[in-house]
C-alpha cells in the first residue's frame, strides 16, 4: 500500500492538523498568522441601542463632522484613486455566489459558508486539494499557471461575518436617515437603500462621516465598505432567506496583481502587449497549454474546472521566461506577467471526488465543457475580439451550440471532443508570437 501524500488523490482524506472540530490543511504558520488578526467572537450591542445612539445626531452635528479635516482614505471605494489602505486591516475586495474575499498585506483571505447538512467538512476541500495535486504532479513550467492556496481551515465558525454585515448595514441605514432628516428606523427597502448608498459612497463628505462612525460603531479591523453593495446582494438574496450562516472554510491565497477580466486596452499595453487582443490570445494560450498538460497526466483525463472564465484567471508577476514543450513545438512566454487558474471549488480530477460538481452535472463532460464556457465569457467580456477576424472566427469553433444544448453559456449535452482538438488549435499561426520563442 502506497503512502498518501499531497501529490496523490488520497491526500484529501488524510488526517491533518486538528483543532477540536476544525481542520487546517497546508501551512499552519500562514493560517495562524491570519487567524491571530481576526476576532471570530466579536459581538455588538443590540441594534436598538445603535438606534438610540444615532438619536444623538442630526443634520447640524453631521455637518460639523464633515467640516473636520480628518479623513480615512480606506473608506473610499478601492477603484477610487483617493483610496489608500492606511491601516493593516482586512479590506473587502469581492463577494460572489460562493465566497467573501478580503485582502490584507500580501494575502487574500476567502471565507466560504458551506452547507454542512449536505457535505462533511472533508468533502469541501477541492479548492485546496485539486490545485495542490495538479501542481505536485505537473513537471514543467505549466505548473506555474495554477494558483495554490497556502492554507485552508475547515469547519470554522463564521457567524461573525454575517453579524458584522448586519451591524454595518444598520449603521449605514441610520447614518443616511440622519443625513436626510428622516425618522430613524431599522426597516429598509433594498432598492431604496442601495440607491441612497450608491449616490453617496464616492462623496468626500460621506467618507468623512464613515471615518468617524465606522471606528466608533463597528470598531473592527475588517473594512467591508468597499463593494458593500456586493455583500448586500449576497446576504439579502432571496435564495438565502432561511440560510444558516454558521460554519464554513477559510482559505488563504497569494495576492495577485489583477484578475484577467480587469485588463483593458490601456493596461494591456502597459503590461507589454501590442494590443488587448494579443493579451487575450496570451491568456487563452496559457490556459490551453495547462489543460493539455493536465490531460497528459495518468488518470487525469477527467479534469474539469467547471468555472473557467476571465475573472477566475489571475495575473501575477513573472520574473523569468515560461517555457512549455508540446510535441515538437516549444511555447515561450517572455512577458513580465503570467496567468494562473484560480477558484477550484467545483473542480474534479483523477480520484478526487467533488460532490458539488457530481450533483450539478447530469451528463458526462470533459475539457470541452470548460472551454465552451470560457470562449462564451471571453467574447462577452471582450467584444474587441471581433475586430480580429481570424481569431474570432477560430473561437467560434468552440461555441457551435443552440438554445437546446446550451443554457447561460453552459453545455447541457455531452460533447466529448478529444484533447487533440485543443492541441491542434493552438498550433495555428494565431499564436505564432509564442511558438518556438518568436516573441
From Swiss-Prot:
Compartments where located: Host endoplasmic reticulum; Host endoplasmic reticulum-Golgi intermediate compartment
Chain segments annotated as coiled-coil in the UniProt record: none
Catalyzed reaction equations: L-seryl-[protein] + ATP = O-phospho-L-seryl-[protein] + ADP + H(+); L-threonyl-[protein] + ATP = O-phospho-L-threonyl-[protein] + ADP + H(+)
EC number, as in UniProt: 2.7.11.1
Residues the entry annotates as binding ATP: 93-101, 117
Post-translational modification: Phosphorylated in vivo. Autophosphorylated in vitro.
A Pfam family of this chain: Pox_ser-thr_kin
Active-site annotation: 307 (proton acceptor)
Ranges for domain Protein kinase: 87-439
Presence of the UniProt keyword rRNA processing in the record: no
EC category: transferase
Keywords for this protein: ATP-binding, Host endoplasmic reticulum, Kinase, Late protein, Nucleotide-binding, Phosphoprotein, Serine/threonine-protein kinase, Transferase
InterPro entries cross-referenced by the UniProt entry: Poxvirus_ser/thr_kinase (IPR008790), Prot_kinase_dom (IPR000719), Ser/Thr_kinase_AS (IPR008271)
Domain of life: Viruses
GO cellular component labels: host cell endoplasmic reticulum; host cell endoplasmic reticulum-Golgi intermediate compartment
A GO molecular-function descriptor: protein serine/threonine kinase activity
Induction of its expression: Expressed in the late phase of the viral replicative cycle.
Function, in words: Essential serine-protein kinase involved in the early stage of virion morphogenesis.
Identification of the protein by name: Serine/threonine-protein kinase 2
Native organism: Monkeypox virus
Amino acid at each position: 500500500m502506497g503512502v498518501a501524500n499531497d501529490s496523490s488523490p488520497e491526500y484529501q482524506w488524510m488526517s491533518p492538523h486538528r483543532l477540536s472540530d476544525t481542520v487546517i490543511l497546508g501551512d499552519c504558520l500562514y493560517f495562524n498568522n491570519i487567524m491571530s488578526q481576526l476576532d471570530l467572537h466579536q459581538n455588538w450591542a443590540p441594534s436598538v441601542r445603535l438606534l438610540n445612539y444615532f438619536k444623538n445626531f442630526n443634520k447640524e452635528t453631521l455637518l460639523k463632522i464633515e467640516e473636520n479635516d480628518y479623513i480615512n482614505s480606506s473608506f473610499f471605494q478601492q477603484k477610487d484613486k483617493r483610496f489608500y489602505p492606511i491601516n493593516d486591516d482586512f479590506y473587502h475586495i469581492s463577494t460572489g455566489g460562493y465566497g467573501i474575499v478580503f485582502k490584507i498585506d500580501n494575502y487574500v483571505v476567502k471565507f466560504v459558508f458551506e452547507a454542512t447538512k449536505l457535505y462533511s467538512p472533508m468533502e469541501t476541500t477541492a479548492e485546496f486539494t485539486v490545485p495542490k495535486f495538479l501542481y505536485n504532479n505537473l513537471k514543467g513550467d505549466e505548473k506555474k499557471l495554477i494558483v495554490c492556496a497556502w492554507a485552508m481551515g475547515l469547519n470554522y465558525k463564521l457567524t461573525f461575518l454575517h453579524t458584522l454585515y448586519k451591524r454595518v448595514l444598520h449603521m449605514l441605514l441610520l447614518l443616511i436617515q440622519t443625513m436626510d432628516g428622516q425618522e430613524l428606523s431599522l426597516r429598509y427597502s433594498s432598492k431604496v437603500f442601495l440607491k441612497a448608498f450608491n449616490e453617496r459612497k464616492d462623496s468626500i463628505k460621506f467618507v468623512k462621516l464613515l471615518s468617524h462612525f465606522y471606528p466608533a460603531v463597528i470598531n473592527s479591523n475588517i473594512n467591508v465598505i468597499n463593494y458593500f453593495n456586493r455583500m448586500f446582494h449576497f446576504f439579502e438574496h432571496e435564495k438565502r432567506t432561511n440560510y444558516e450562516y454558521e460554519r464554513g472554510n477559510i482559505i488563504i491565497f497569494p495576492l495577485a496583481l489583477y484578475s484577467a477580466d480587469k485588463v483593458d486596452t490601456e493596461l494591456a499595453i502597459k503590461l507589454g502587449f501590442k494590443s488587448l487582443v494579443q493579451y487575450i490570445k496570451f491568456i487563452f494560450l496559457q490556459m490551453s497549454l495547462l489543460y493539455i498538460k493536465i490531460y497528459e497526466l495518468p488518470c487525469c483525463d477527467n479534469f474539469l474546472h467547471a468555472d473557467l472564465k476571465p475573472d477566475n484567471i489571475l495575473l501575477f508577476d513573472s520574473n523569468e521566461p515560461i517555457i512549455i514543450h508540446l510535441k515538437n513545438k516549444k511555447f515561450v512566454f517572455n512577458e513580465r506577467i503570467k496567468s494562473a487558474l484560480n477558484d477550484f471549488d467545483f473542480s474534479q480530477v483523477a480520484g478526487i471526488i467533488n460532490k458539488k460538481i457530481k450533483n450539478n452535472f447530469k451528463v458526462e463532460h470533459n475539457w470541452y465543457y470548460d472551454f465552451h464556457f470560457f470562449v462564451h465569457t471571453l467574447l462577452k467580456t471582450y467584444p474587441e475580439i471581433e475586430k480580429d477576424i481570424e481569431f474570432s472566427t477560430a473561437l467560434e469553433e468552440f461555441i457551435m451550440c443552440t438554445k437546446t444544448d446550451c443554457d447561460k453559456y453552459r453545455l447541457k449535452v455531452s460533447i466529448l471532443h478529444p484533447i487533440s482538438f485543443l492541441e491542434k488549435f493552438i498550433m495555428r499561426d494565431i499564436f505564432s508570437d509564442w511558438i518556438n520563442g518568436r516573441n
